Amino acid sequence: MIRYKAIISYDGTNFSGFQRQPQVRTVQEEIEKTLLRLNSGQAVKIHGAGRTDAGVHAYGQVIHFDLPQQRDLEKLRFGLDTQTPDDIDVIQVEQVADDFHARYQKHRKTYEFLVDLGRPKNPLMRHYATHFPYKVDFSVVKAAIKKLRGTHDFTGFTASGTSVENKVRTISRATVEKDDKTGFLIFTFTGSGFLYKQVRNMVGTLLKIGNGRMPIDQIDRILESGDRSLAGPTAASNGLYLKEIIYDD
């Protein structure tokens, strides 16, 4: 068997997430249906680096899969790209070592989160940015987000009921920028891994701090206590993008 790695992007609006689930449309299912056709009716399972939730988008999701024969890489990419639905794009395909694993190989992920501060909101971006029609002190958000950098136990920023035991993660980049032209806030987080709904919970908390309904040092309290109830609400999924995955050499 030959192992292939692919970089894909997708519009998450009409997907119930990346991972295959019964009776709903998922990214994994659509790509596996295409690979079934390209592999003469033989089933092919794909493995993704990140399991994005319903409504979450991706610029640079990474998958791997095995095929029984060597393929021309561009023809394989083209076949996948043209035979998957229009809301999936296959950007690149390459052959990798047999032991490469998209999820378990050591890597860093970068997520981006777009917040539309417009009043009224931009209707053309309703599926691609989370609307927050309240005042936000940008300087306060900028100060608060710095507290998330470094290695911490992020228990207070994950969804309750998660089965992951070790909730210590390292965030190497946590920034926020303001696009004065669009009125959007652009949050960027890079880390060694993220817990379930962690990014959305961090953004929801930062927006509440920026709106003056939480103090900046609330971040410290959440990190120290691990108490989810101290954090802000979970931001909607439509503003979240899996931007890039970089593997260690």
Curated annotation (Swiss-Prot):
* Transmembrane spans: none
Q: What is its EC number?
A: 5.4.99.12
What molecular function terms (GO) are annotated for this protein? Answer: RNA binding; tRNA pseudouridine(38-40) synthase activity
Write down the Pfam families for this protein, in alphabetical order: PseudoU_synth_1
Alphabetized, the UniProt keywords read: Isomerase, tRNA processing
InterPro entries given for it?
PsdUridine_synth_cat_dom_sf (IPR020103), PsdUridine_synth_TruA (IPR001406), PsdUridine_synth_TruA_a/b_dom (IPR020097), PsdUridine_synth_TruA_C (IPR020095), TruA/RsuA/RluB/E/F_N (IPR020094)
What are the positions of the active site? D53 (nucleophile)
Q: What class of enzyme is it?
A: isomerase
Q: Which GO terms describe its biological process?
A: tRNA pseudouridine synthesis
Reaction equation(s) it catalyzes: uridine(38/39/40) in tRNA = pseudouridine(38/39/40) in tRNA
Leader sequence range is none
Entry binding sites for substrate: Y111
Briefly state the protein's biological role.
Answer: Formation of pseudouridine at positions 38, 39 and 40 in the anticodon stem and loop of transfer RNAs.
Summarize subunit and interaction data from the UniProt record for this chain. Homodimer.
Q: Which family does it belong to?
A: Belongs to the tRNA pseudouridine synthase TruA family.
Protein's recorded name:
tRNA pseudouridine synthase A
Gene designation per UniProt? truA
